[in-house]
Amino acid sequence: MEWDTVIGLEVHAQLKTKSKLFSGASTAFGATPNSQTSFIDAGLPGVLPVLNEQAIIMAIQFGLAIHGTINDLSVFERKNYFYPDLPKGYQISQYQKPIVTNGYLNIQLGNNLEKTVHIARAHLEEDAGKSLHDAHTDYTGIDLNRAGTPLLEIVTTPCLYSAEEAINYLKTLHQLVRFLGICDGNMQEGSFRCDVNLSIKPKGSSVLGTRTELKNLNSFRFIEKAIAFEQARHQDILESGLSVIQETRLYNPDNNTTQAMRGKENENDYRYFPDPDLLPIHIDKEQIEEIKNNLPDLPEAISKELKNTPSLNDEDINFILSSPDTYQYYKKIKSLCSAADKTIINWLKGQYAAFLNEHTLTFETPPISAKTMAAFLSKIHEKKISSSIAKNIFSMLCAGEEDIDAIIEREGYQQQNDNSALEEIVEQIIKQYPEQVTEYKAGKEKLLAFFIGQAMKQTKGKANPEQINLLLKKHLG
């Protein structure tokens, strides 16, 4: 029997606010357990939450970026459940009146296909604390540093039908929240986590099957493997004549399986009701318009613009959009530099990227400023230095030097463009290698690169390769 897989995703994006959603405690990652916990985060009686306005602005930014509806009235509600790392006994979230509804995100699939993923809602809520099972041998510790950190929960409709679609959507969403500047996207630190709701149904059926929820996945690779395992598990159960249990499961990467965590709750089980300590949020059109006018450049629009640059291919564009810092670095260089787009991107994704990887650096803290890199690439474009000399200069720039003209002067790197001097060198090379000349004239044209190499060797890389190329062709006939 053939089956259709149906997937809906819930992503928790941790917002890049300096303080928590309802308290002034810091959201910095990695602090000593419980050192960033206020009375509000700890759920002590007699304290009242105060809403972080920056979180509202970030949620509106996201809503605008996904073409969603920003609701003029939004309400916080208490989501009631018991868990050791939830000291209040409830989580402040949004249910009936979220801040954003009815958005979408376009994703790219194979064979140049595009799919629109419908986003049902995006709402604000506070994160829970963290249970530390390995910190002690005979009991579990609770760290409330994370409790109260603002999350934007982004919920799709069940409109994804394969692991490929799910991963492409998640990568596109991950890219978007980073370019918006609302989430750092650090999956290892839990800043971007995903719950997968999955069911299968007979192929072509309009009736959805019983779903299971895979909780707190924080790796694209693990998400893909968890979906594949859960698809196969559902299929085995149904083809054995049994029924899938609606439950929450955890993925175990050590043995690539999922295991039951608890029965899956329905929304009614949480007994949502409006939080009496928080006023409804009223958002006016003027505020939305102001935020819209200050949105940064976003990946979809940038990609369309870059595709109009004939010299850039998809690989180049993907590299430029690999992070907001990479894009901003490229954009700054392009604004200051006379070099062609392809020259810029070849250097950035070639030698520069290799250096960054080798030294565990990123374009967030580049070893060469965009201004210096632009000046360097302009020298190459203007043929003031050869490509081989450029590699030497680049190494010096990576080591901390900044004055390119001083390097050229000190090292004697000025490009040799004297036509008569270069012509003498070409004539000497032709006399020096008569056998290769005969082979070249017999049709072995690849030997031209050999002759150019000899000329560059004699001039210690200072000759203009294009001039050498023309002179060789002239003398070799």
UniProtKB/Swiss-Prot annotation:
Keywords: ATP-binding, Ligase, Nucleotide-binding, Protein biosynthesis
A single BP term in Gene Ontology: glutaminyl-tRNAGln biosynthesis via transamidation
The organism's place on the tree of life at top rank: Bacteria
EC number annotated for this UniProt entry: 6.3.5.-
PROSITE patterns on file: GATB
Record note on quaternary structure: Heterotrimer of A, B and C subunits.
Protein name: Aspartyl/glutamyl-tRNA(Asn/Gln) amidotransferase subunit B
Originating species: Legionella pneumophila (strain Lens)
